[in-house]
Amino acid sequence: MNPIGVVICNYNKKDFVLQCVQSVLESKEKNFDIYVVDNASSDGSAEALKKAYGNRITVIENKENLGGSGGFNTGLRIVRDKGYSYFMCLDDDAAVDENALSVLYHYMEEHTDTGMAGCRVYHTQMSDYIQQSGLLIDFDNCTAKTIGADMPEDGSLPDVIECDTVATCAVMVRADTVKQKGVGIMPEDNFIYWDDMEWGYRIKLAGYRVVTLAEAKALHQMGANTKKENTFINYYMWRNRTNFFMRFTPEAQMEAMSVKVMGAVFDAMYESMFREEHNVRQTISYAFYDALAGVRGKADSYKIMKNDANDNKLIQTLQGRKSFAIEENNQEEDAYYLRNFIASVCPDLREEEQTKAEIVFRFCDYIFYSEKMPDGKEILIDSERNCVVDENDIEICKNYGYSKWLFIYMNQGVFLAAARRMRGEIVDE
């Protein structure tokens, strides 16, 4: 029997998943079996896979879209029950180097204290740039930090990186770890997002090492940088992130965590209100209160709405102008993207010196944190392209601080009670 069961989860990415399977089959070492789980795709993925690869792979067809974690778990249950020593998880839009599986396998064979080993993942369209090489859970700021994100591959990162978790786009897991108390397979009730982070962190809490290996290389598409049609991502990211920190934050940091998480949720909703992105704001609100209520799994359909994210305020500010200037304030990259945006929407607008320009964009870290409001022809702008243009905007910014602490004050008791109620509920599959 081969020691590695490869599980690929696919949803409507026919062309990508065919490339993913092909990359695995081209691996130098052939000690694996491939299982592709199709999450009820409508693009003919399952038929294309069967036609292209026949009995070289096993295609499992779910009757409905079970999400990323549910799709992976369909395959993980099979490879677990068949007795494979290692599980290799791959996203449908990932592709592995010919040595990747071999490098991961031999490392884990030699390092029995390692429960999860991931590839160093590069951007498919910019293969010299790292997408991620593991993640660290930052309990002080209640977020996850991606190691090596978007940095050029210059050899400066260690060959073996110790981390808290690894994204399941290209990761190998020791089968014995899922038998440990509190680990199990992927947390299916996430549906999608933060499921892989929780799984890896569970493995680490069980006493295993979690690493990424530079010699195990993979490419990952990870979607185009375009506006999404609906608020799907907003809902699952916010609900599952909130749930994660409610469950896993060390007891001594619980109160600080509640302030950080609720502060981040408030910032996202207040910013959406300011930008008149009412559907985005409503979805984040649903996500937050669902996290407090312990709502898991697939969201009710009414909570996923048309994405109304926009740059209307900035575009309206630019219209009818003839010239602009930018005060960068050490935010050169943000200024670069602003120039590109202006060129795309108002190509005739010219950049001039501040004294001659009709409007001057002054960069700050975040408009709601800025102590200095704009005056005259100044427009305050931040990296998210939030901009303060008129007296009404200034008034909203002035109300931000009090509104934020009122939101935290009103919700903290309920938040902490909900967190303590759900802690300790991690169960084996």
Where are these regions (language model features)?
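Non-catalytic, C-terminal membrane-associated alpha-helical segments of glycosyltransferases
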Residues: 253-322, 400-429
